[in-house]
From Swiss-Prot:
Record's function text: Together with LptE, is involved in the assembly of lipopolysaccharide (LPS) at the surface of the outer membrane.
Protein source organism: Paraburkholderia xenovorans (strain LB400)
Protein's UniProt keywords contain Manganese: no
Protein name: LPS-assembly protein LptD
Subcellular location: Cell outer membrane
Length: 789
């Protein structure tokens, strides 16, 4: 309503022209800014610092906000170039007019304030600041204390959350809630011409709950509508909120065009649910659902996927993934991992988008539940383990059930000792395979002598195993093998080394160079173990990590006989100023005093050699982000390079990385006579302003084919990002037994300030490129004191 005409008869209320004048403090001033601070300093930092002893003035370390005392009311201030009014009734101001109370500021060309109704009417270039939210328009009417009122044709900005927009009208319900009619919303900094915005018939905003709701909302990007919904909920900042997430698109040779539209339910701070309809042009509509939960004592997730009547296979297809971890307290815990798919080709055809760009196809699905106990030296595991195996993978043995107990004590008078006891009932889904029970007990005792520049560690351990087989297969055990038998095998190791160091200066830089010779001796007598099936045992790899272990097998069904000595020499170059290791060189070889007779299969011949292949490795870290790692295995008797890997990495700055690697393994029987001869190149590099390229290229030189390849682009704008990638990947074998490949495409558009969800593209970039740096997140929202008025 228009301002009331004020009487000019009272001298104290006469119109007095001036440039700026504080007219009245209508109510006593108990405190200026009550109860607003989100964070407070504590301790000595929060104490005022004296700066003027005679006057007792102090420098406050932060804004202090004093709550009102009981019975006190906040002060109201009216300012203007010219003012008129009646004390304790109303006041009118013109020219740079203002009304202030607590966190509410109303500015206008002219305004009228009625104390009885607490109503402020503002006209002309109105600017309302309410609890950090800013509204600009031609006219506003609101109750100052309750922050209730309306404004016509407003432009608004939420200072703390960063959102802004415009509308035909806004109704302010209080200092946090507001309703906009026929408005827009964006989180872009350039509100006049935003890259994306939501347009709706009505918006409900609650800055306290950090939530916005658009009715009949349409999402525009670069001026074009990309999504519409009769009800669209979204967060006003980076906090989680229920609502529709941005749709994702992909294209593959096996599925055609795909469109996924996730809907996110923020059930509670520690629980959420995501429902995702997934349209697959060649197969139909799949529904995906993921429920996550978290508490101080348990956490987990349940994911289900269902595709009714696949257009290509004419079957219903599904997948179920359950993961649960439980902490019962006092060292007790439990877990459940259950994963199942409907058919053998499900992971190839319908792998979820999050896993789409991961290399390879999952063929083993774990189904396991267990109880654990960990307390001091004790570690106990009781579990039931099963596997779903997809062709052409070979099924592993399950443990149905297993009880494993470990005990370990360290440095008890210089001694380390412990034991592992295990009972397992091994079962397998493959027909006509040996099954049965195994009881194992492995105690050990070692004593370490460590001094300046040397160490000596002798160790003795024993392997006891008892087998009770309930089914024998002619395919994996020799004829006449008993069903019940035991094994007892001792092992003695002796590990010793020296460490020398000296100061050196290389290219003007001071380093500490070390020289570290090491000897490792192993003795294990021969025991015939061909009666034992291979439940969990395979050949160990041969490298720098395995050369100092007593057994050449992994698992407990084979203990290799040994009488060998491993000799190694390591030298390091350490930056004398920082302690950073800049270079390392290692060379090692094993020397055999007798031939190893224990083999995995009875048909294999035992190794006959006086020494092993030579193993060497080197790692370098140079300036300007350059690093290199090299390792090779060389057979001096045959003058053959058995295995090598050479890798280089260059990362001069964030978002810039190039990796080059070469891998080679000579053909041998343990690798099914299949050599490895591959070149791997990957990297991330800025191509132009805000544009980054991401790529991975793995090429098989022997087979003249691409093992896997990925090419992607990322564009990082102020309030949106766009990523796209295309991948060529190995996808199993065809009916002729030859390798087959597939191609797929995935795009991801992210609106900063509206949503942040990865549909699998960022995961692919991160896993494909070592040293990959994600695009920077949007800047944090401004403080409510920014642009303070």
């Amino acid at each position: 309503m228009p301002p009331r005409q004020l009487s000019q008869t009272t001298p104290s209320c006469a119109v007095v022209p001036r440039k700026r004048r504080l007219v009245a403090a209508l109510i006593a001033v108990p405190g200026l800014m009550p109860a607003l601070a989100h964070a407070q300093l504590v301790g000595e930092a929060a104490q005022p610092q004296p700066i003027d002893a005679p006057w007792g003035m102090q420098l406050a370390p932060q804004l202090e906000e004093r709550p009102l005392q009981p019975g006190q009311k906040p002060a109201t201030f009216v300012l203007g170039d010219t003012t008129s009014g009646t004390t304790d009734q109303d006041m009118a101001a013109k020219g740079s007019a203002e009304v202030r109370r607590n966190t509410v500021v109303i500015k206008a060309d002219a305004l009228h304030y009625d104390q009885d109704t607490d109503m402020a009417d503002a006209y002309g270039s109105v600017h309302v600041v309410n609890n950090g939210n800013s509204f600009v328009g031609p006219e506003a009417h609101m109750r100052v204390d309750s922050s209730e009122g309306f404004m016509t044709a407003p432009k608004y900005h939420f200072n703390v959350t960063g959102g802004s927009g415009s509308a035909e009208r806004v109704d302010l319900l209080d200092n946090e809630r507001s309703v906009f009619t026929k408005g827009t919303y964006t989180a872009c900094a350039c509100a006049d011409d935003p890259a994306w915005y939501i347009k709706g018939s009505e918006f409900d905003f609650d800055t306290g709950a950090d939530e916005g709701v658009a009715h009949n909302g349409v999402l525009f990007f670069q001026g074009f509508p990309v999504f519409a919904s009769p009800w669209l909920s979204f967060p006003l900042s980076g906090e989680r909120r229920s609502g529709v997430l941005p749709p994702t698109f992909s294209l593959s040779s096996s599925n055609g065009f795909e469109l996924s539209v996730p809907y996110y339910f923020n059930i509670a701070p520690n629980r959420d649910l995501t429902l995702t309809p997934r349209l697959i042009s060649k197969r139909g509509v799949q529904l995906q659902s993921t429920f996550r939960y978290l508490s101080p004592t348990y956490s987990g997730s349940i994911t289900g996927e269902f595709l009714p009547d696949d257009h290509l296979t004419k079957t219903n297809r599904y997948a179920l993934y359950i993961q649960h971890n439980q902490n019962f307290g006092n060292g007790f815990g439990g877990y459940i991992y259950y994963n199942k798919v409907s058919d053998n080709t499900y992971p190839e055809d319908l792998s979820s988008s999050v896993n789409q760009f991961m290399n390879g196809t999952q063929l083993l699905y774990q189904q396991e539940a267990g109880l654990t106990y960990n307390n001091g030296p004790w570690s106990v595991l009781a579990r039931e383990q099963h596997w779903q195996t997809l062709t052409p993978s070979v099924a592993p043995y399950g443990r149905e059930p297993q009880l494993n107990v470990k005990y370990a004590k360290y440095n008890v008078g210089g001694f380390d000792y412990g034991a592992e006891a295990d009972y397992s009932n091994f079962r397998i889904t493959t027909a006509d395979m040996t099954q049965g029970q195994r009881v194992m007990f492995n105690p050990y005792l070692s004593y370490s002598v460590v001094g300046p520049g040397y160490f000596v560690t002798p160790k003795v351990q024993w392997h006891f195993a008892s087998y009770n087989l309930n089914h024998l297969s002619d395919a994996d055990v020799a004829a006449g093998t008993p069903k019940n038998f035991t094994e007892s095998i001792p092992t003695l190791t002796f590990d010793t080394g020296l460490v020398f160091d000296r100061s050196v200066r290389i290219f003007g830089q001071d380093y500490i160079q070390t020289l570290e010779p090491r000897l490792y001796y192993v003795y294990t007598p021969y025991r015939n173990q061909q009666s034992a099936p291979l439940f969990d045992t395979a050949d160990s790899d041969f490298g720098l990590a395995e050369i100092f272990t007593p057994n050449t097998f992994v698992g407990n069904d084979r203990i290799a006989d040994a009488n060998r000595l491993t000799a190694a020499l390591t030298t390091r170059f350490i930056d004398a100023a920082t302690g950073d290791e800049r270079a390392r060189f290692v060379i090692a070889q094993q020397y055999y005093f007798q031939d190893q007779r224990v083999t995995l299969q009875s048909t294999q011949t035992s190794a006959q050699a006086t020494h092993s292949d030579l193993i060497a490795g080197a790692s370098l870290k140079l300036g300007a982000g350059f690093a290199s790692e090299t390792a090779f295995q060389y057979n001096a008797d045959n003058n053959q390079l058995v295995k090598t890997s050479v890798g280089f990495g260059f990362s001069p700055a964030t978002g810039k990385v190039i990796n080059v690697a070469y891998r080679y393994t000579r053909a041998n029987t343990t690798l099914d006579n299949t050599p490895i001869n591959q070149v791997l190149i990957s990297g991330q590099w800025p191509l132009a302003h805000r544009v980054y390229g991401v790529g991975r290229f793995n090429y098989d030189l022997g087979g003249h084919r691409i093992v896997d390849g990925l090419v992607g682009l990322q564009y990082d704008a102020d309030c949106w990002t766009l990523g796209a990638g295309i991948q060529r990947y190995a996808n199993g074998l065809n009916t002729s037994g030859q390798n087959q490949s597939s191609t797929r495409f995935l795009a991801q558009l992210t609106f900063k300030g509206l949503s942040s969800v990865d549909n699998g593209l960022m995961t692919a970039f991160r896993s494909s490129v070592a040293g990959y740096t994600p695009l920077p997140p949007p800047p944090p929202p401004e403080s409510r004191f920014t642009n303070y008025e």
